[in-house]
Amino acid sequence: MKTSEAHVMKRLLTYMWRYKWLTALALAFTFLTSLLLTAIPLAARWYIDHLVDSTETGSPVLTAFQFLILYYGLFIGRVLATYLSQLTFARVSNSIVRDIRLDIFKNLQRLGMSFYDQTAAGSIVSRVTNDTQAVADMFSTVFSSLVSSFLLFLVTLVTMFSLDWHLTIWILPFLPIIWFSIRLYRKLSNRLVKMTRQKLSDINVKLSESIEGMRIVQAFRQEKRLTDEFEQINAEHLDYANRSVDVNSLFLRPAMTLLQVLAYAVILTFFGLKWQSSGFTAGLIYAFIQYVSQLFQPLIDVTQNFATLQTSTISAGRVFEMMDRDDYEPKQAGSLKEIERGDIRFDHVSFSYDGKRDVLKDISFEVKNGQTIAFVGHTGSGKSSIINLFMRFYEFDRGQVLIDGQDIKDYSQEALRKSIGLVLQEPFLYHGTIASNIRMYHKELTDEEIRQAAAFVDVADFIESLPGGYDHPVTERGSTLSTGQRQLLAFARTIAAQPKILILDEATANIDQETEEMIQNSLKKMRQGRTTIAIAHRLSTIQDADCIYVLDKGKIIESGNHDQLIALGGTYKKMYDLQAGMMK
């Protein structure tokens, strides 16, 4: 994946090109700032030469008054131009970062589950927030400073040549030394900056992991272990940050200031040697000394901003790396726009997550509209993998999956998502209200349809007992509601969409027995007229399934209804007897 510094800068400039007129305005204000800043020493030179060295008669008070008006006029103009330049660059910066965040978020929505299964959530959050903010800092601070420094350096150098080119030539040997210093600094600091950003991402990962799993952390008394791990990562981040500071402290202002002092010494020596023969005026000497300072100041600013520039470039590279990820969810041909009935057939399907070891081996089954089938088996037998393939979270390796006799790949993504209702073991609720969580993206659903869906799964009474009813606020992940309540709301969300196919992935595994009994009738009503595939942990919940498939190590080893499997006396019966014994 191409993330070189030149490539990163080129891509960032393409974002800036979207706001080319606003950027051009910012550059114009920056150029005006440089001109006004360069004009101030010229005004001082005029004042000194006409007041101190001039033999012309005239009122000193009038000359001083004219100088003050000119000087403060230039100063106020420079301040105003600087303000407008920074303001415009900030607008461009904020717009660019908004676009980058939107683009990376859009790409995250397209990425398949394989990406999320392999990437820590904290790392993703770090790139979308911290790294994009570093890019914002680059445009609002670094880029504007670099442009301003370049223009000021160029205008100052031209002005110095126009004043006295002999003097200016004595300054030129310092430029290659400065260039070499900058190159050496970049070489030494690049790796340190990259590792500092990586350790910051690791901190976000560990923090996110700790917060999301706090119940488990406290239940298993893992606070000290996690604290030690966090302290180690934090110490590594501190080490790289301090090493970066060491390099910055050596190569930034101290080195540039030393070169500036040497330049002063050279110029003053030249003035001393040539004073009698050159005819230098006091105003020229003052202006030239000011321009030497003004010539070095942009170089000092550039070196000071290199640390931020490198951080921003590396951060932008990390952002573009994620933006360029193309391990999307499986592609759909999209020629079929609607599922008519919901008949499903798996025909000799095999699948591997890593491309080496099959987790599903030659899976074949069929379920008609209105029928219910269930998959049971020990952990790791492949039950959830079947759901992952059918939901098109992953692409199967061999075989074929058909819906209504058509290849599942021929349906549009919208048709599949609209016609399939998925209820997971861990129900997920979004920040919002009860009604918005039931409605989800189906904006066309009326409030009455929301209430009907809630009543259908017997959760309406609970909702209406809440303060605000359907407008009751839901916190992130619905943490203030019980697992059973969240699951009932997930059922209401599913039924509100009126899917033709129902997928229940251990949907009652985390519900207490009393709540389970309460929703069994609702589940039966939900399944009527719909093709239903259920993954079950509690065998008691799928005894009325038309067919039950027993999986072991990715293969179907038994199939039949409950009575047939009990009579068979195989794995299913052993599982059933074990659960029945635990219930006694």
Task: Report residues per predicted region.
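Transmembrane helices of ABC transporter permease
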Residues: 22-34, 74, 141-195, 269-280
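Juxtamembrane helix-loop junctions of ABC transporter transmembrane domains
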Residues: 2-5, 28-29, 36-49, 74-121, ...
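Alpha-helical segments in transporter systems
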Residues: 21-42, 71, 88-90, 136-149, ...
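Transmembrane helix-loop-helix hairpins at lipid-water interfaces of multipass membrane proteins
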Residues: 23-81, 161-166, 278-282
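Helix-loop-helix
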Residues: 55, 159-173, 247-317, 322-323
